[in-house]
């Protein structure tokens, strides 16, 4: 899935390396579909819905192409939008990224199959990252702070840069984390380089998937934020 959340960036990279194929949705029963549904908010006042329907489970590279009477829609409040195709997935965007905004995702089928009209998820609380200087020495490290959430939801971090070895991990939603001296590691041969870098955090929340998807799946929403800086020796 494409970037808003940085997990999506990794998925795009992995998808590019793997062979994929598509099958018409009208050739597959809902009971044989695995659903991967996400909502991402990156702090720009919008939320992007991404849906990837696959045949063969979570590790499959066979994606459904919506055909015939089948359709994918997303609803927020009184606004319903159809998802449009983007590569192997389907996407749409809504204005707004407030905490607890509910998204209802529907896979509506033709008369010969079972619809899955009620997968739902709400956005976690938004936040902002602070505490990172404009230039950070790799021999010093930094402390990143943010507004801790009220629900103890899982968070992940990613540190990356033009001259850095990319790193990622999971942390508690405590409002602060330390990237110690020496943890930002330069790519071999670029130990003395200064480069553009970013530290990103993502707060995640799971939703409820419509049980009609016989192969199961996941539905989640994330608030993702990044802080840019210069990484120096």
Question: Which stretches of residues belong to each language-model region?
Answer:
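Surface-exposed loop/turn and intrinsically disordered segments
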Residues: 84-142
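Exposed aromatic-hydrophobic patches
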Residues: 89-96, 175-189
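Bacterial N-terminal signal peptides that target proteins for export
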Residues: 1-9
């Amino acid at each position: 899935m494409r970037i808003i959340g940085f997990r999506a960036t990794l998925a795009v990279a992995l998808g590019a390396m793997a062979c994929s194929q598509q099958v018409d949705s009208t050739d597959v029963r809902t009971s044989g579909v695995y659903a991967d549904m996400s909502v991402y908010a990156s702090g720009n006042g919008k939320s992007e819905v991404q849906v990837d329907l696959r045949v063969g489970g979570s590790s499959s590279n066979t994606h459904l192409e919506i055909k015939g009477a089948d359709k994918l829609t997303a609803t927020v409040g009184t606004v319903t939008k159809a998802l449009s195709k983007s590569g192997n997935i389907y996407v749409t965007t809504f204005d707004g990224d407030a905490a607890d905004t509910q998204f209802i995702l529907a896979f509506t089928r033709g008369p010969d199959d079972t619809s899955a009209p009620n997968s739902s998820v709400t956005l976690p609380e938004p936040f902002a990252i602070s505490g990172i200087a404009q230039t950070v020495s790799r021999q010093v490290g930094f402390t990143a702070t943010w507004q801790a959430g009220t629900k103890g939801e899982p968070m992940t971090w990613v540190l990356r840069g033009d001259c850095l070895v990319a790193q990622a991990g999971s942390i508690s939603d405590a409002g602060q984390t330390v990237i110690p001296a020496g943890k930002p590691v330069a790519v071999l041969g670029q130990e003395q380089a200064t480069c553009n870098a970013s530290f990103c955090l993502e707060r995640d929340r799971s939703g409820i998937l419509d049980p009609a998807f016989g192969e199961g799946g996941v539905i989640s929403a994330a608030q993702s934020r990044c802080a840019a800086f210069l990484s120096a020796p």
